[in-house]
Amino acid sequence: MVEVKKTTKTKSTEEKAPKITKATKEKTSDKTALKAKTPKTKVSDKAESTPKKASVKTSAKAEKINVEKTEKVEKVNVEKVSIKRESSSKDVQKADFSNIKELNSKIFEFEKNYDQAIFDCILSERASRRQGTHKVKNRAEVSGTGKKPWKQKGTGKARAGSLRNPIFVGGGRAFGPSVNRNYKISINKKVRLNALMASLFALAKSNSVLLKTFSLEKPSTKDLVEELRKINASNLKRILLVSDDKNIFLSARNLKNVKVTKVTSLMIEDLVAADLLILSNENIKYLEGLIK
């Protein structure tokens, strides 16, 4: 009997032991799984929840920014349109100067376009304005001794014969500009005439030529401005007035948008840059004489 009890006890212990280990293992595994899952799920929930909130905020902000941008763009466009309208009204309505019927001269019938001739003439006009009075001293004119600075050999330095050499500080200038240099560029008469006629035709085509004779009793800038205001030309940027009257020349000296010149000294650059050319019938006759 005793032996049987012992065997039963051992059996029961052997049977109970594995059951406890399995349960504990399952429980521990479940606990570890839960522990491992819980923080990850929390982090994932946070990570999933935060971008959603951020996306809503960013979308709302983006919508606000887009609305503000569209409003700004609309405002800017309206301002630009208004500026354009103002500029068109200020540009003195070039269509008002369309006196093509009065411009029956051969000068304004020169339909050929000589861009290269105009370019060459402008270059020659600009070059002729250069005085060429620049001057620098060469090695013969600069002050200094003519003594050899150090002996030819034995010093380890490069050989030198004079301290007035252009390589030294205080030496003369090598190949510097000389006195009274002539910068003029010669242009053929036919080329200049073609450029003149082409520029006049371009002004007539754009309705920028006005036939009118200006005359003032005395030099007065105020009176000249009034005369220009009568023809709606006071707001133009560049007005080229061809006249021999000294009073008009003195009256226009203080006006930055008006240039007075004689017919004999018309420049191609002034004609190309002019918004309005004011001529008299006498000036047209002189220009017609150049064509013959």
UniProtKB/Swiss-Prot annotation:
It holds the Pfam family Ribosomal_L4. Residues 1-33, 42-51 have a biased composition (Basic and acidic residues). Keywords: Ribonucleoprotein, Ribosomal protein, RNA-binding, rRNA-binding. InterPro entries: Ribosomal_uL4, Ribosomal_uL4-like, Ribosomal_uL4_dom_sf. GO terms for cellular component: ribonucleoprotein complex; ribosome. It comes from the Bacteria. Transmembrane segments: none annotated. SUPFAM superfamilies: Ribosomal protein L4. GO terms for molecular function: rRNA binding; structural constituent of ribosome. GO terms for biological process: translation. Residues 1-59, 132-158 are annotated as: Disordered. The keyword rRNA-binding applies. HAMAP family: Ribosomal_uL4_B. One of the primary rRNA binding proteins, this protein initially binds near the 5'-end of the 23S rRNA. It is important during the early stages of 50S assembly. It makes multiple contacts with different domains of the 23S rRNA in the assembled 50S subunit and ribosome. Forms part of the polypeptide exit tunnel. Part of the 50S ribosomal subunit. Belongs to the universal ribosomal protein uL4 family. This is Large ribosomal subunit protein uL4. The gene is rplD.
